[in-house]
């Protein structure tokens, strides 16, 4: 699943081989500060472009919602259904229950920080897809997927719950959906899509008593690594992950095209039994320009 923050990046995602695309509308998504957010009237064209290539179109409506916004949410859900949007990605129960009530497929957002089987069981009454928290290890992901299969946990469609994970992109300093750093510093909430990403900045560590500056190897002390799983993609797919999500709705179309094409090629290689360390290293070289800090794989 590839990101689209503009029509340019939407085209890039589809050119890169994405079989699904996620996007936001206006201020009701986790990229509300973006300058090139789509508008509600763009929905029919977004869906048409995706469906022309056989890709699914997923609307992110994953911020926390206040009472005065519920009518706007309902109107947007109605417009999404009319336009043929394939699913809504959400974390607020007000959005989830309304979308479900009007027959829109629901996918649980990473903002719901789903980390365990109890959460999966609960959300299965509303959602067919669950995006697991970024912070889970590969072993934890595997146990949840095995649990879904063993217990036969099904969503509203009647099919087994599908598990989606973020495969590439930024890692938050906090557990997904639980960071308040931007709100505390700038009164701009990450959970309202308005994160200033102060954790992604360079910092100096100073001893307040002596004034001495501490020597550190990485000045990005609160965000030392980005998420990059291409070198362990065979293990991830072998664990039973159904959807690989690529972060980047605020990135350039070139970024989207490169990352999408690399992961598409790598996933195909896994399915065809052609994945190898040598090919993984080659994919990593192509991704180097798409890593802001340092890369890390999965902690097993």
Protein language model annotation of sequence segments:
Residues 1-3, 21-23, 57-61, 88-90, ...:
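Hydrophobic faces of well-ordered beta-strands that scaffold small-molecule active sites
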Residues 293-300:
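Conserved small/polar residues in nucleotide/adenosyl-binding loops
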Residues 13, 92, 123, 165, ...:
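Conserved, mostly hydrophobic/aromatic
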Residues 107, 111-242, 256-259:
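Catalytic alpha/beta core domains of metabolic enzymes, predominantly
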Residues 1-20:
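N-terminal basic/disordered segments at the start of proteins
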Residues 35-43, 93-99, 136-149, 253-255:
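Active-site-adjacent beta->alpha loops and helix N-cap segments on the catalytic face
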Residues 39-100, 105-115:
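Active-site beta->alpha loop and helix N-cap motifs at the rims of alpha/beta catalytic domains
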Residues 22-41, 61-68, 250-256:
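Glycine-rich, proline-tolerant flexible connector loops at the mouths of alpha/beta enzymes
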């Amino acid at each position: 699943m590839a990101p689209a923050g503009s029509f340019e990046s939407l085209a890039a995602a589809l050119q890169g081989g994405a079989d699904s695309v996620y996007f936001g509308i206006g201020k009701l998504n986790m990229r509300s500060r973006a300058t090139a957010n789509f508008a509600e009237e763009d929905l029919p064209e977004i869906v048409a472009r995706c469906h022309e290539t056989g890709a699914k179109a997923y609307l992110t409506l994953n911020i926390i919602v206040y009472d005065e916004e519920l009518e706007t949410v309902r109107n947007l859900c109605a417009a999404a259904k009319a336009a043929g949007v394939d699913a809504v990605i959400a974390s607020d129960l007000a959005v989830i229950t309304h979308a479900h009530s009007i027959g829109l497929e629901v996918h649980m957002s990473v903002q719901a920080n789903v980390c365990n089987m109890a959460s999966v069981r609960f959300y299965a009454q509303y959602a067919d897809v669950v995006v697991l928290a970024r912070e889970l290890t590969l072993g934890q992901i595997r146990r949840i997927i095995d649990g879904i299969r063993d217990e036969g946990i099904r969503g509203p469609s009647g099919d087994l719950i599908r598990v989606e994970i973020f495969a590439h992109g930024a890692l938050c300093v906090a557990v997904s959906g639980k960071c308040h750093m931007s709100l505390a510093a700038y009164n701009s909430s990450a959970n309202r899509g308005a994160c200033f990403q102060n954790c992604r900045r360079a910092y100096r560590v100073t001893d307040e008593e002596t004034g001495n500056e501490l020597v550190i190897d990485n000045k990005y002390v609160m965000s030392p690594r980005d998420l990059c799983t291409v070198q362990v993609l065979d293990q991830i797919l072998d664990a039973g992950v159904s959807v690989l999500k690529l972060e980047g709705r605020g990135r350039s179309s070139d970024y989207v095209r490169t990352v999408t094409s690399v992961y598409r090629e790598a996933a195909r290689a896994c399915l065809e039994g052609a994945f190898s360390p040598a090919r993984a290293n080659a994919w990593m070289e192509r991704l180097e320009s798409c890593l802001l800090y340092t890369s890390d794989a999965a902690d097993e």
